[in-house]
Amino acid sequence: MGLEEKLPGGILLSTVEKVAGYVRKGSLWPATFGLACCAIEMMATAGPRFDISRFGMERFSATPRQADLMIVAGRVSQKMAPVLRQIYDQMAEPKWVLAMGVCASSGGMFNNYAVVQGVDHVVPVDIYLPGCPPRPEMLLHAILKLHDKIQQMPLGVNREEAIREAEQAAMALTPTIELKGLLR
């Protein structure tokens, strides 16, 4: 029994949000922010063995104004943080951020004054990808999880309110440098 038999008269019912989410998830243009060894794995993902282009990401954007996904790969220094925020602010809406690797997610093994202890203190992060460095398969899995998140994202006024609340919640978190963990 195929789809044609289940749909009366060939009519498919959906919402604009679901259709827009479906279309939007298949055409992400990433702006790479490769700062360390994770960038090498990100480049390998674009090669023929892993083929990131099957997810609609064959074009890596050279300018933030044409990108809608920022992949932060590696540690972010205190001096690089304002540049990262400026690039994020230049990206057009809708935009998403993927923190690739332990250094981008939490500062990694560089627990000192010069390294930002998690890029989420500079820009709101949508997907965290662990690993040192994460394998290309893990990056592809994170992209698929981001696709799911994009497809469920609301549109219009509801979307702007959801983004505002998420960004305020992310910026209000306790900085990881103040947390007492294994390295303290």
Curated annotation (Swiss-Prot):
Catalysed reactions listed for this entry: a quinone + NADH + 5 H(+)(in) = a quinol + NAD(+) + 4 H(+)(out)
Record family assignment: Belongs to the complex I 20 kDa subunit family.
Gene3D superfamilies: 3.40.50.12280
Record flagged with keyword Lipid metabolism: no
UniProt-listed NCBIfam families: nuoB_fam (TIGR01957), PRK06411.1 (NF005012)
A GO BP annotation: electron transport coupled proton transport
EC number per UniProt: 7.1.1.-
Gene Ontology CC: plasma membrane; respiratory chain complex I
Function: NDH-1 shuttles electrons from NADH, via FMN and iron-sulfur (Fe-S) centers, to quinones in the respiratory chain. The immediate electron acceptor for the enzyme in this species is believed to be a menaquinone. Couples the redox reaction to proton translocation (for every two electrons transferred, four hydrogen ions are translocated across the cytoplasmic membrane), and thus conserves the redox energy in a proton gradient.
Binding site for [4Fe-4S] cluster: 37-38, 103, 132
Record GO terms (molecular function): 4 iron, 4 sulfur cluster binding; iron ion binding; NADH dehydrogenase (ubiquinone) activity; NADH:ubiquinone reductase (non-electrogenic) activity; quinone binding
Pfam families: Oxidored_q6
Subcellular location: Cell membrane
HAMAP family: NDH1_NuoB
Keyword terms, alphabetized: 4Fe-4S, Cell membrane, Iron, Iron-sulfur, Membrane, Metal-binding, NAD, Quinone, Translocase, Transport
Ranges in a coiled coil: none
InterPro entries: NADH_UbQ_OxRdtase-like_20kDa, NADH_UQ_OxRdtase_20Kd_su
The protein's name: NADH-quinone oxidoreductase subunit B
Protein's membrane topology: Peripheral membrane protein
Gene: nuoB
